[in-house]
Amino acid sequence: MPAWSLDRARHTYSIPYWSDGYYDVDAAGRMCALPRGAGGPMLALPEILDQAAAQGLKLPLLLRFSDILGDRLRKLQAAFGRAMAELDYQGGYTAVYPIKVNQHFNVAGELAAQGGEGFGLEAGSKPELMAVLGLARPGSVVICNGYKDREFIRLALIGRKLGLQTFLVVEKPSELAIILEESKALGVTPGLGVRMRLASLGAGKWQNSGGDKAKFGLLPRQVLDLVARLREAGMLESLQLLHFHMGSQISNVRDIANGMREAVRYFVELSKMGCGIRYMDSGGGLGVDYEGTRSRGFCSINYGLDQFAHTLVQPLAEACKENALAPPMMITEAGRAMTAHHAVMVVNVSDVERAPEGSVPTPQAHEPAVLRHLRETHAALGTRPILELWHEAQQALAEGQALYALGQLSLEQRAQLDDLFYAIAHQVRGRLTGEEKSHREALDELDQRLVDKYFVNFSVFESIPDVWAIDQVFPIVPVARLDEAPARRGVIADLTCDSDGRIDTYVESESLDSSLPLHAPRVGESYRLGIFLVGAYQETLGDIHNLFGDTDTANVRMTADGGHEVVRQRRGDTTDVMLDYVGYKLDDLRAAYRAKVEAAGLAQAEAASLVEALEAGLTGYTYLHETTHD
C-alpha cells in the first residue's frame, strides 16, 4: 500500500470527485473551501472555526460560503449559454430558484441579489410567495407552483400588476376558473402555465415526482380541456408556459433526455393549437454527485452541467427548426444544484467507543466446550484455511451466546467468549485482502464488526434528516490532520436517544462503504468532522427530535483582497426556546425549580448555586459543550 500523502487523503475521502472544485486539502492537511472554484483562494476551515469561536459561536456549526452560491448560478447559466451557442438556439435561458430547497434569507436572498438578468424565483405556498414577491428583481420571472386557493392566486396576480412576470402554473383543473375570476376582478391579464404529467419516469428516490401517478400535473385529456376553456374565454394567448418535473435528483442523463423529448411533443402540439407558448420550464432534476462516483447511483449523477444543458436544449432546438416555431425561453428549477455545495456542517466528536481488541484468556479447569473450541480455532490460525476458521469462530460465538441465554455460561465465561472471538477476528482481518474475490464477503462483515463508534455532537434528524428519511449520502471528512494517515475505522452516531440517529453509508475512495477511515482523537484536542453538501433541503426539513434545535450558523464571504470575513452569524436554539415551542411555560418551570430547591432544605449559598445552574441549563445551547479528549 502506498505511503500516506495529501493526494491519498484526497482519494480516500473522494474529495476531487464530489467537491466540484469547491473543497480541497492544503499543505498543512487542513480541509479548505474554495468559494470561487478550483484555482481560487483557499480558506482553511480550522481558521474559520477559530474566528467563529472568537465571535461566540459554538459547534455544531453550519458554515455557509455565500460566494459558492453565486458561482454555482453563473456556471449553470454559462453551461446553457454554451449549449445554445453550439445548437444555434436563440430562445434564451432563465435559471429559476425554487425557494423550498432552502428558504433561509441568507440563501434565497443571496441568490436573488447575485442573480441579475436570467434569474427568477419559484414559490409553492403562500408564505413562500410572500417572500418571493419581496425578493424578486423588477421584471423577473416568478413561477407559482403547488396547490392554490383564491388568496394565493390573487397575490400572484398582484405580483404581475407590480411588474413581475408571475406565472400561475395550473396543477389541477379546478384552479383555472378561480384564476380567470380573480384576474378579471383585478383587471390584469394572467400569465398562465400548465404542468404536464409526463409518462416518462426517472429512477431514484424522487421518481414519484413524474409519471402517471405523480402528485401534480394534468393528464393529456385535461390539457386539451384546459386549452378548450381558454379558447372559449378568448385567453388562449395567456397560456405562455409549459412546465414538467421529473424529480429532484435524476441520476441518469437518459431519463432526462426521455422526459424532454416527451415534453417537446406537448410544446409542438400546443403551439400548433394557437397557444402562445413562450417559456419551457423543465423543473428540477439536475442532480448533485454526493457519492463522487459519477454513476447512476441514487445519490450520484452520470453527467455534468454541460451535458445536462445540451440534453435539454437539443430536442427543443430541433423541434423548433423542424416545425418553424419561435424558440421559447428555457427555464430550469435546479435548486439542489445551486445550493448543495455552499454549506458545511462542522461537528465535534464527543466520545469514541473503541472496537473490542480481544485477548486470549488464561485456560481454566472445566472450561465449557465452546470456549475450548474457540481456543483451538485461535491456535490454528497459522495452519488452516483462514475463511474456514472464520466461519467456525462465528458459529462458536453464536452457540456461546445461546448457551449464556439458557444459563449454561457465567457472565465471566460470556466475556471470555467475546475476548477470544475478537482476538480471532482481528487476526483474520489482517490476513484477508480485497483483491481476493473469495475474501470480500468476510472482509465486509469484519469491517462492520471491527469499527469504532464515534459519538458526535449533533442530531441526524435536525441537521441531515435525509440520512434518516431516505438513506441519503453526504461526504464526511476530518477538517484537519489530513496529512496524517487515519489509523482507525469508525461509524458515526449522534446525540439523540434513537437507534436511527446514526450514519450507515460513507463516501470513500470513489465508492461507498459501511464505515469511514478516521483518526484516533488526541489527548487535549477536539476532533472535528465536516459534513459536506448539506445546503439543499436539510435545514428546512430538520426535526426537533429530543428537542435538539437549530445549530449556530455563520456566513463566510470573500473580500476584495482575496481574504474572507465571517458575517451574518445566527445563534442556534436554546433550551428555553425549544421548550416554549412545545408548549412549556417558562415561568412555571422556573417556579417549579425554585419550589424544589426550597423543599430540599439546602443552605442559602448552595440553594442559590443550584438555581443559577438550573437557569443556565434552561437558557443554554441545546447541544453539548465542546470538550477535548482525555
For each feature predicted by the language model, list its residue ranges.
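Low-complexity, highly charged intrinsically disordered N-terminal segments
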Residues: 20, 25-98, 103
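Charged, compositionally biased N-terminal leader segments and the immediate start
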Residues: 1-31
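Flexible, glycine/charged-enriched surface loops at secondary-structure junctions
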Residues: 59, 63, 85-90, 273-277, ...
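Short glycine/threonine-rich loop-to-helix capping motif typified by GTGT followed
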Residues: 250-258, 289-307, 337-352, 543
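Short, glycine-/Ser/Thr-/acidic-enriched flexible segments
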Residues: 30, 38, 68, 102-104, ...
